[in-house]
Swiss-Prot record:
The modification N-acetylmethionine is found at M1. This is Conserved oligomeric Golgi complex subunit 1. Present with 2190 molecules/cell in log phase SD medium. Belongs to the COG1 family. It is a peripheral membrane protein. One of its GO terms (molecular function) is protein-macromolecule adaptor activity. Transmembrane segments: none annotated. Keywords: Acetylation, Golgi apparatus, Membrane, Phosphoprotein, Protein transport, Transport. It comes from Saccharomyces cerevisiae (strain ATCC 204508 / S288c).
């Protein structure tokens, strides 16, 4: 008010209107900035709200327990001990082992917190807005539990909770949104700590599922990042270079699983290659690649333009396939099977696969390619044949020669590995 009165005394109406517009503009900018910051920090606000809610619930529980402790006489009141009868000789039986040593209350608290952390992890990790906090609490309480001796009366409880955690991890492997580092920490927890408490069958299932999940990601990025302490230009994620992850990737267990999985993948490709080569013996089942799209009825009615990006890319790709002699769907599938297999064999050598296994797989692929080469050679037209269509025979011969050269190059590449 003190600022407005002088304005009316000393300024004209247009100046007052300008001041009002300027004030409205400032209010609008301030409101926009507030909304922007509110959206930017919305997740933090939700996280804080969740924490406050948890704290409030805990305080209510503590308050109820404290009231019960103070006023529930039937449960907590200490009655006066009856006087002991006077005896000259007292025979006391020796206490059992569990009665000789009382359990410290601190140890009971550790076991209780550990039990709660497992319940929270299994019940809330999927839906919580702060899953990392629940995960960290689980590992922390496992660490605290490892520092105390577990009393025999609690061993059944500990084993039961460990089994529950294992079942949850196995059943929820595909739905849990954990980071690579968190998965590795769980693997280390289940394979290096509390070994006597874990169920062996569930542990085996967990390990196999975990490795399969990790191998579905970019394994090559893992191996490169673990071997190089500097940031990789394609994979700058810090978790790839964490010491725990690096040690895990460089472990013999990881390498053995990776080699077994890769060998299985190569054998699958070899089986596919055998099936495709058998299909070549039935020419009526082959479908020629259509580079000109003569059957495309929509090409001239404006529905699809030959200049569309997808159509243009398809023309170029098909032309490249033709230049390599890949003129039908089966030879193209053979090429698309062989080429990745060669790359996988190179990776297998990087994984330090036993040389005899590597040589055996390479020889199997070379043998199949040589048989494929023989099939191609048998399709080359003889120069003594009377051609009914010189142009067709020339194109067929040209394509087969290109395909033959492609296979020869692949065999040479394999032998030079």
């Amino acid at each position: 008010m003190d600022e407005v009165l002088p304005l009316f005394r000393d300024s004209h109406i247009p100046q007052i209107k300008d001041y009002q517009l300027e004030l409205q503009n400032d209010l609008t900018k301030t409101n926009e900035a507030f909304q922007k910051n509110l959206l930017k920090n919305y997740n933090k606000i939700l996280s804080l709200t969740d924490s406050v809610n948890d704290l409030s619930l805990n305080l209510k529980n503590v308050d109820q327990d404290f009231k019960s402790l103070c006023f529930n006489d039937e449960k907590f009141q200490l009655n006066k001990l009856t006087p002991l009868p006077y005896q000259t000789t007292t025979h006391i039986s020796p206490p059992r082992d569990e009665e000789k040593v009382s359990i410290p209350s601190q140890n009971i608290l550790v076991i209780s917190n550990w039990t709660i952390s497992i319940n929270n992890f299994c019940n809330r990790i999927v839906t919580s807005t702060t899953p990392s906090r629940i995960f960290d609490e689980l590992l922390l309480n496992f660490h605290e539990l490892s520092l105390i001796p577990v009393p025999s009366k609690f061993e059944a409880l500990v084993k039961d909770k460990c089994c529950r955690l294992q079942k949850f991890l196995v059943d929820s492997m595909k739905t849990l949104n954990l980071t690579l580092l968190q998965w590795v920490k769980l693997y280390n927890l289940l394979n290096t700590e509390f070994s006597s408490k874990w169920d062996d069958d569930l542990l085996s299932i967990f390990n196999e599922s975990l490795f399969e999940t990790l191998f579905n990601d970019n394994v090559q990025a893992l191996l490169i990042s673990s071997a190089n302490s500097k940031d990789h230009q394609y994979h700058s994620n810090q978790q790839y270079k964490d010491a725990i992850v690096v040690d895990f990737v460089n472990s013999s267990t990881f390498r053995d699983h990776l080699i077994r999985r890769t060998v299985k993948e190569i054998n699958t490709h070899l089986d596919t290659l055998s099936t495709l080569r058998a299909k070549l013996k039935e020419p009526e089942t082959l479908h020629k690649l259509d580079i000109f799209h003569d059957n495309d009825t929509n090409l001239n009615d404006g529905t699809v333009s030959p200049l569309d990006d997808d159509a243009l890319k398809q023309y170029i790709d098909t032309a490249v396939f033709y230049s390599k002699g890949l003129t039908n769907d089966t030879t193209l599938q053979i090429y698309q099977t062989v080429q990745p297999t060669i790359e996988i064999l190179q990776n297998l050598e990087l994984y330090k696969c036993p040389q005899e296994t590597l040589t055996d797989l390479r020889n199997k692929l070379i043998t199949q390619l040589q048989e494929f080469k023989t099939q191609i050679s048998s399709r080359l037209p003889s120069p003594l044949e009377n051609s009914t269509s010189v142009v067709d025979d020339f194109i067929t011969s040209y394509n087969n020669h290109n395909l033959l050269q492609l296979v020869i190059d692949q065999i040479t590449q394999l032998r030079q590995q």
